[in-house]
C-alpha cells in the first residue's frame, strides 16, 4: 500500500475538463491527482518555412510551469532569456507524441500549436501533458471538421502516456513527486491506442535494473495507458 492509499498498479485519480478556456480552439484541464496541467490547442493558417508549398500541416508544442507550481518558487524561464534543457526536452516529447498519431496531409497547410502549462506539479507533468494535449488537439481538429474546413479528422488514433518506476524494490504505476524523488528507476511510456510505443524513457538512478524489472514496468504502463485511453474517450463523449 502506498502512502496515498493506492495499490502498486493504480493510477491516481485522473480528471479531464474540456473547454476549460474561452478562446482556444481546444483546451482542457487535466489532473493526475495533485498534478494539474492546462493544455490548449491553437490553430494557425500557416506552416513553418520548411513545409510551405507541400500541402501538409504541422503540430508542435510548448511546455512551461508556473513559478509556484512546485513546493518552492522557481524563476520564470522568460526572465532568464532562454528555455532550459528539461523544458526543451519535454516540449519536443509532447510534439513528437502528437505527430505520431496525425495524418499531416489531411491537416493541409495549417499548424496546431499545443501549449501545456503546469499550474501544480506533483510528479508526472510530462505524461499528464501528453494525455491532456491529445484531447485538446482532438477538440480543435473536430471543430475544423464540423465547420467544413477539413474533409476528415486528421487524428488516426489516440495517444497517452504514464510514468512508472521502482521504489523500495517494487514497481509502481504513475509516480507522484515523493515516489519519483526516491525512485531507484524512473520510466515514462508513450503509447498509441493501437498498442504501439511512441517513446520509452528510462533511467536507473541507483542500481541498474533487470530485464524482468523492465518487463514488469512495461506491463504496468500498458495497463495504465489502456485506462487512460478509456478516460480520454469518456471525456470526449461528454
Curated annotation (Swiss-Prot):
Gene from which this protein is expressed: rph
CDD domains: RNase_PH_bact (cd11362)
A Pfam short name: RNase_PH
UniProt xrefs under InterPro entries: ExoRNase_PH_dom1, ExoRNase_PH_dom2, ExoRNase_PH_dom2_sf, PNPase/RNase_PH_dom_sf, Ribosomal_Su5_D2-typ_SF, RNase_PH, RNase_PH_bac-type, RNase_PH_CS
Reactions catalysed, as given in the entry: tRNA(n+1) + phosphate = tRNA(n) + a ribonucleoside 5'-diphosphate
Positions bound to phosphate: 86, 124-126
Record's keyword annotation contains Oxidoreductase: no
Example GO molecular function: 3'-5'-RNA exonuclease activity
Gene Ontology terms describing biological process: rRNA catabolic process; rRNA processing; tRNA processing
EC number: 2.7.7.56
Name of the protein described by the UniProt record: Ribonuclease PH
Subunit field text: Homohexameric ring arranged as a trimer of dimers.
Keywords: Nucleotidyltransferase, RNA-binding, rRNA processing, Transferase, tRNA processing, tRNA-binding
Biological role stated in the UniProt entry: Phosphorolytic 3'-5' exoribonuclease that plays an important role in tRNA 3'-end maturation. Removes nucleotide residues following the 3'-CCA terminus of tRNAs; can also add nucleotides to the ends of RNA molecules by using nucleoside diphosphates as substrates, but this may not be physiologically important. Probably plays a role in initiation of 16S rRNA degradation (leading to ribosome degradation) during starvation.
rRNA processing recorded as keyword: yes
UniProt source species: Geotalea uraniireducens (strain Rf4)
Family under the similarity heading: Belongs to the RNase PH family.
Amino acid at each position: 500500500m502506498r502512502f496515498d492509499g493506492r495499490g502498486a498498479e493504480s493510477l491516481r485519480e485522473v480528471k479531464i475538463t474540456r473547454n476549460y478556456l474561452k478562446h482556444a480552439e481546444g483546451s482542457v484541464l487535466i489532473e493526475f491527482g495533485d498534478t494539474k496541467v492546462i493544455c490548449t490547442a491553437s490553430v494557425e493558417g500557416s506552416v513553418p518555412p520548411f513545409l510551405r508549398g507541400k500541402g501538409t500541416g504541422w503540430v508542435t508544442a510548448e511546455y512551461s510551469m508556473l513559478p509556484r507550481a512546485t513546493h518552492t518558487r522557481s524563476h520564470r524561464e522568460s526572465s532568464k532569456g532562454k528555455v532550459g534543457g528539461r523544458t526543451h526536452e519535454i516540449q519536443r516529447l509532447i510534439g513528437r507524441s502528437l505527430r505520431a498519431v496525425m495524418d499531416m496531409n489531411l491537416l493541409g497547410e495549417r499548424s496546431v500549436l499545443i501549449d501545456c502549462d503546469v499550474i501544480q506539479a506533483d510528479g508526472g507533468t510530462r505524461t499528464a501533458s501528453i494525455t491532456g494535449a491529445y484531447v485538446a488537439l482532438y477538440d480543435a481538429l473536430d471543430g475544423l471538421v464540423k465547420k467544413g474546413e477539413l474533409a476528415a479528422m486528421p487524428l488516426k488514433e489516440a495517444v497517452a502516456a504514464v510514468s512508472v518506476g521502482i521504489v523500495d524494490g517494487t514497481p509502481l504505476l504513475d509516480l507522484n513527486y515523493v515516489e519519483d524523488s526516491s525512485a531507484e528507476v524512473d520510466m515514462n511510456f508513450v503509447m498509441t491506442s493501437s498498442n504501439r510505443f511512441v517513446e520509452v524513457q528510462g533511467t536507473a538512478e541507483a542500481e541498474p535494473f533487470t530485464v524482468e524489472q523492465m518487463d514488469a514496468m512495461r506491463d504496468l504502463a500498458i495497463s495504465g495507458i489502456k485506462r487512460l485511453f478509456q478516460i480520454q474517450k469518456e471525456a470526449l463523449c461528454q
